[in-house]
Amino acid sequence: MATKLKITWVKSAIGYAKNQKLTVATLGLKKLHQSVLHDDTPAIRGMIRTVNHLVTVEEVEA
């Protein structure tokens, strides 16, 4: 089965660089403590690496 990533926004992006705010939005996160599911791809992993201090990530079997 394909692995998916559950990404949860846990810390506000206020005071951080604009590219980090845009990355949070690109991941599909609109509100704090919201979670989204994404396929485990190198592009998504790169975005997570950019904002790893603002989000938590869990691997989910889908």
Swiss-Prot record:
Keywords (A to Z) from UniProt: Ribonucleoprotein, Ribosomal protein
**Matching Gene3D superfamilies:** Ribosomal protein L30, ferredoxin-like fold domain
- Where are its TM segments located? none
Q: Which cysteine pairs are covalently linked by disulfides here?
A: none
Pfam families according to UniProt: Ribosomal_L30 (PF00327)
Q: Which CDD domains match?
A: Ribosomal_L30
Does Lipoprotein show up as a keyword for this record?
A: no
Q: How does it assemble?
A: Part of the 50S ribosomal subunit.
Question: What NCBIfam families would the database entry show?
Answer: rpmD_bact
Task: Specify the protein name.
Answer: Large ribosomal subunit protein uL30
Tell me what organism the protein belongs to. Heliobacterium modesticaldum (strain ATCC 51547 / Ice1)
